[in-house]
Curated annotation (Swiss-Prot):
Catalyzes the 2-thiolation of uridine at the wobble position (U34) of tRNA(Lys), tRNA(Glu) and tRNA(Gln), leading to the formation of s(2)U34, the first step of tRNA-mnm(5)s(2)U34 synthesis. Sulfur is provided by IscS, via a sulfur-relay system. Binds ATP and its substrate tRNAs. Keywords: ATP-binding, Cytoplasm, Disulfide bond, Nucleotide-binding, RNA-binding, Transferase, tRNA processing, tRNA-binding. It is found in: Cytoplasm. Interacts with TusE. The lineage of its organism: Bacteria, Pseudomonadati, Pseudomonadota, Gammaproteobacteria, Enterobacterales. This is tRNA-specific 2-thiouridylase MnmA. Disulfide bonds join C102-C199.
């Protein structure tokens, strides 16, 4: 193949997806090396932090495949460009998605630059479940073949240039196939469970972790009717649509239906709740998004029909998108949607193609 001599640096996380990605690229004739990124300085020796075990697994896989493993420390870049923004958003009462920020600032910026400049790479590769297709000289981002594992939601900030320099080998496979390949090869990561922790926190307890950096401020929990029914330990621990962990049961006069967070009054440190997962206060007819990133990097003007996800693993929502100005859009859903959360990302699709997205600035509530 013509790509034979091309050098690919695979971001090795110590998980099964990046392990199999490295092997697949070897089979395709690339010159493959691995890179393990250290993005967080463990300052606590907590058992939740799995970085050392992940590095050992990445090294074992590279040894088995006969490829070199480089390591790099991006902790300073991570702190400045991901973590501080993450804390600022929480402080402002919003719910950010750090994995999206990490992909934008670390995996497809710091890693991409380091691989090209320091390691002489032609491409980088990751274990993300997405695909790329080159159309009219521009690379497009497509959903992963395994719709259950598709991760395009987390990669919407990438430009066509970044996608052109990236390979996503497992995006063409389904997860069970990936595990089967790892088992057949005898890789230590074959049965390792997928990480669920936020990228820098690993599997540790989120509330405890956040409390170290942002002092919690307890406040009132009130109903949509204005009745005080409890106390929250800090607005930052709660997100719209949340049901668990509120510590309140049904009220004497009310029903036994569960309570849901419908609003956060940051100014007065009040958590607003209502009963029922389809309460009108939980529903939105649309949203305003900002900090837009379109994969083709063409400015968006006018209006378009497409579908949107306002959180990961959500079913696509048909919608109409209208440009408000250079960096803001209005999105109107065909049907009302529950728990649209400021700080999270709205990501747009045309069929299999991920068009891009933006940060939800505000939700447009159901008219009362």
């Amino acid at each position: 193949m013509s790509e034979t001599a091309k050098k690919v640096i695979v971001g090795m996380s110590g998980g099964v997806d990046s392990s199999v990605s490295a092997w697949l690229l070897q089979q395709q004739g690339y010159q493959v090396e691995g890179l393990f990124m250290k993005n967080w300085e463990e300052d606590d020796g907590e058992e939740y932090c799995t970085a050392a075990a992940d590095l050992a697994d990445a090294q074992a896989v590279c040894d088995k495949l006969g490829i070199e493993l480089h390591t790099v420390n991006f902790a300073a870049e991570y702190w400045d460009n991901v973590f501080e923004l993450f804390l600022a958003e929480y402080k402002a009462g919003r719910t950010p998605n750090p994995d999206i920020l990490c992909n934008k600032e670390i995996k497809f910026k710091a890693f991409l630059e380091f691989a090209a400049e320091d390691l002489g790479a032609d491409y980088i590769a990751t274990g993300h479940y997405v695909r790329r297709a080159d159309v009219d000289g521009k690379s497009r981002l497509l959903r992963g073949l395994d719709s259950n594992k598709d991760q395009s939601y987390f990669l919407y900030t990438l430009s066509h240039e970044q996608i052109a320099q990236s390979l996503f080998p497992v995006g063409e496979l389904e997860k069970p196939q990936v595990r089967k390949i790892a088992e057949d090869l005898g890789l230590v990561t074959a049965k390792k469970k997928d990480s669920t922790g936020i990228c820098f926190i690993g599997e540790r307890k989120f509330r405890e972790f956040l409390g170290r950096y942002l002092p919690a401020q307890p406040g009132k929990i009130i109903t949509v009717d204005g009745d005080e029914i409890g106390e929250h330990q800090g607005l930052m621990y709660h997100t719209l649509g949340q049901r668990k962990g509120l510590g309140i049961g049904g009220t004497k006069e009310g029903t036994e239906e569960p309570w849901y967070v419908v609003d956060k009054d940051v100014e007065n440190n009040i958590l607003v709740v209502a009963q029922g997962h389809e309460h009108p206060r939980l529903m939105s007819v649309g949203l305003i998004a900002q900090q837009l990133h379109w994969v083709d990097r063409e400015p968006f003007t006018g209006t378009m029909r497409c579908s949107v996800k306002t959180r990961y693993r959500q079913t696509d929502i048909p919608c109409t998108v209208k440009a408000l100005d250079d960096d803001r859009i209005e999105v109107i859903f065909d049907e009302p949607v529950a728990a649209v959360t400021p700080g999270q990302s709205a990501v747009f699709y045309n069929g299999e193609v991920c068009l891009g997205g933006g940060i939800i600035e505000q939700r447009l509530p159901l008219p009362v």
